[in-house]
């Protein structure tokens, strides 16, 4: 699903840029981790333990890095990016530095008021990705923010009234929310939102509690089959590629042996301007000293950023991106 800001004639332009970046082995997607600070308390992530003093080291602009890489897709993430009061300035600087781009923001949504959403939209955000792993109180518990789910759903009408027309839920597939995946998709469809799935991994802090063990793989296969069937009948809601959804059970069964291409099509730039190939890897160099990455023999995760980078660019993938959910 795309914002109404984008028209069908943008497709060949984006495909041309995608081809150019791929041939040149330049990143198609750059994640700007604008802060490692976070006010959530997720059990599977330790970013919330980042000292408040880290704020002093955060870059005041990512525009030069954006101009250097000239990616097709840009994501502002963290930590919790909306903690930065100057986030609009950061977004506007990057938006002005790159031609032909698609800019997204990943947030837990707890501080995304309609007014703030409109301000970020005007600065250049094209899509808001709000984390949502459960439809009940488990979401509040998992994120450590009381009332978070109600706050997110309560703000959606106001955000849409501000003219923001592109909201997705980012849902992590975990052992204890397999029963929630299809209901989340249906709720998103009712709200005119999209859903993007990513498989849980313990590589952030070693928490294995949410890993899907081998005896749960048949259930995982059943759920992903249901998601694929829904996707075939309702284009524009689930925004993952068929390839990614089909490959998730294979990864869970330990059947994925291909090297990871993180760092080739996607990179992460931390709050100080240093580059890492993966969000769970240490940094390698400052962006001004960037060196091209090679595939790495790592099977620690099957995040969407890895799986989607391996998905073939077919016509069906273009339809996935262009289609919009029907209210």
Where are these regions (language model features)?
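Generic beta-structure capping elements
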Residues: 33, 131-133, 200, 278-281
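Radical SAM enzyme [4Fe-4S]-AdoMet core and its adjacent flexible, acidic
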Residues: 54, 118-262, 271
